[in-house]
Each structure stands twice: as C-alpha cells, then as structure tokens.
C-alpha cells in the first residue's frame, strides 16, 4: 500500500517481491524433505517385511478401522476444521466486509492476536501428553460454540455507526493514474473523517475520467473504512486472540490424537482422510457457507455463524460420547 503504481507494477519487482522471497522458503522446504526419514516404527516394519500391501483396502474396507476413520472425522477433525477457519479467515472477512473495519487495521490486529496465541499450540500439545487429548479438544469446541455469537455481536456493536452526510472531511487526498492500454484516467478520492466522539472513518471513491469526453463515469465505487479507536482496536485484538486460543486447543493435540488411533502399517493412510476432509471440506466451506447464509438472510448479520456452530455441536456430541481419552498409549502396534 506504500508503493506507487509504477513501483507496484515494475517488471521484476512490486507485487512480485513476495514470490521472489518465497524461493527461499521453497529451498528450505526441499532441504527439510531431503533430510526426512520414515519413523522408527515404520522403518522397523519395513525392514521386517510387515508393511501393508494395500493400505487403502486395509484402512477403508476393514470395518473396525473404517469405524475409527469416521469417528476421527465426525468426533474430532470436522470440529477442529470449522473452528480453525472461523477464528481466523471468517473473522477477518467479517471485520472487513460486514463491519467495514479499515483494511490495514484488520490485518494488523489479526497478526498481533495470532502472534500472541501461537505459543499455545505447544502448550496444549504438551498438556495433552499429561492429561490426554480428548477433553482439551472438546473444551475448545464448547467454548467456541457458546462464545462465537457474543464475540461477533461485539464486533458489530463497536463498529455500528453510520457515515454522516453533514460532516466535512478532516483531509482529502485525490490521486489519478492512467488506466493500462487507454488514455482514460482513474480518479481516487480518499476522505478522512473524525466524528465528535473521536470515532474515525475513511471513504474511498473511485471514478473513471474518459479522455475523449472529459467526463466522469456514471458508475462509482464507494468504499467505507472505519478506523478503530485505540481502545476498541485492542479490545478486538483480545477477542481475536480468544478465538485463536480455541484454535490452539483443538489443533494442538490433533496430530498426536490421530496417530494414536491407528496401527503403524496403515496409520498415514487412515489419518489422512479424516484430516483432509475435516479441514478441506468442513473447514474450507466456512467462508462460502457463511457468505451464502449472510446474503440469503440479510436481517441477521450473524447468521453465517450457525454453520460452524452447528458442525462444532455435532462434533462435540459425537466426540464426548464415543472418543476415548487415553494417556501414554503404546503406539508400537
């Protein structure tokens, strides 16, 4: 956002910088993968010739094992998936699109909350070694179920102020740039307002100036960005932190939990299906279904939350009733 149009669209720079930097990450990733080896237990099975000939068949056609696959999906991972996506992606989308929070503020408050919450992945993983995985994940789901709507309602309440029509902007910035391949210009007018109670907001209006006629386009794009006061900003950081804390509770123990559910020779195959469906399908659909519900039932801005809450409720019931909370389980089978 601090780059000029020319710098942003430079042939070898600008928007390409993140992709150039990612080359380093690709190199690190390749190096790590080249140094990785099979787990000691799987290596032992392989040396003894006891690996599965058809892991797909053993995982999904064996009724007892397939039951565990389904239990892992519907009793743990689908809840973990929707809580992950709601606490981060849906929350950010809600702040920007529904609450109209300033783009840069929403990004920075998310980053701060994530930074503070990240160590809790390790904490809950460590604690699950001591007291078991199940109830840490179940408590995380329960907390999310009962607090999502109050948290998102707070987002709405603290950003619910209309843009007045009788107030002059504190400052006005007008920027023009040529549209690529034409002689027409894009006119961007940014106005910053401060309300009597200290609340701030910004409007961005874009118009097209046609070269031939010298006239403005009829169509306009108006963007309203609400700039959060300092107290509200940190309040939102705390609420986002709380939701990501739920993420750490359900996600921190999940890898060890899945490993402990399946025998070594078909472990990776068996745990892959519930993990990827739980996150990719149930979790991945949170933004889409949330938006679909919000546009269909416009009277309730929070209606999109019923999908992740409903999935988490179902997962909590199944997990609480049917999952076992084993500690220090021998996984050498």
Which residue ranges define each predicted feature?
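A late C-terminal transmembrane helix in Major Facilitator Superfamily
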Residues: 265-295
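Helix-to-loop junctions at the C-terminal end of transmembrane segments
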Residues: 121-131
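Low-complexity, proline/glycine-enriched hydrophobic segments characteristic of transmembrane helices
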Residues: 152-238
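Flexible cytoplasmic inter-helical loops of multi-pass small-molecule transporters
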Residues: 34-57, 332-333
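Cytoplasmic membrane-interface "Motif A"-like loop-to-helix N-cap segments
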Residues: 130-141
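Extracytoplasmic gate region of multi-pass secondary transporters
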Residues: 65-114, 152, 183-194, 201-203, ...
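A membrane-interface helix-boundary motif in multi-pass transporters
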Residues: 2-21, 221-231, 294-310
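Multi-pass alpha-helical transporter architecture, strongest
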Residues: 29-36, 147-158, 310-333
């Amino acid at each position: 956002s601090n780059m000029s149009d020319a710098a942003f669209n430079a042939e070898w720079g600008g928007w390409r910088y993140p992709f150039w930097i990612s080359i380093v990450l690709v190199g690190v990733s390749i190096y790590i993968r080249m140094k990785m080896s099979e787990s000691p237990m799987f290596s032992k099975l392989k040396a003894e010739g006891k690996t599965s000939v058809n892991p797909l068949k053993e995982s999904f056609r064996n009724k007892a094992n397939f039951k565990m696959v389904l239990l892992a999906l519907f009793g743990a991972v689908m809840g973990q998936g929707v809580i992950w996506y709601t606490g981060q992606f849906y929350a950010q989308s809600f702040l920007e699109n529904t609450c109209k929070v300033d783009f840069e503020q929403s990004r920075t408050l998310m980053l701060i909350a994530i930074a503070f919450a990240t160590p809790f992945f390790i904490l809950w993983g460590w604690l699950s070694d001591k007291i078991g995985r199940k109830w840490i994940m179940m408590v995380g789901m329960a907390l999310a179920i009962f607090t999502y709507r109050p948290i998102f309602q707070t987002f709405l309440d603290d950003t619910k102020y209309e843009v007045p029509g009788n107030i002059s902007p504190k400052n006005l910035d007008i920027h023009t740039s040529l549209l690529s391949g034409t002689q027409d210009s894009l006119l961007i007018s940014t106005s910053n307002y401060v309300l009597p109670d200290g609340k701030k907001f910004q409007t961005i209006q874009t118009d097209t100036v046609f070269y031939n006629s010298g006239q403005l386009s009829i169509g306009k794009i108006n963007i309203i960005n609400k700039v959060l006061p300092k107290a509200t900003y940190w309040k939102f950081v705390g609420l986002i932190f709380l939701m990501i804390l739920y993420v750490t509770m359900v996600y921190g123990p999940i890898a060890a939990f899945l490993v402990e559910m399946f025998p070594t020779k078909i472990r990776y195959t068996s745990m892959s299906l519930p993990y990827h469906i739980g996150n990719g399908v149930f979790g991945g659909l949170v933004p889409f279904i949330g938006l679909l519900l919000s546009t269909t039932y416009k009277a309730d801005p929070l209606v999109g939350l019923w999908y992740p809450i409903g999935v988490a409720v179902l997962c909590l019931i199944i997990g609480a009733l049917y999952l076992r909370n084993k500690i220090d389980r021998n996984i050498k089978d």
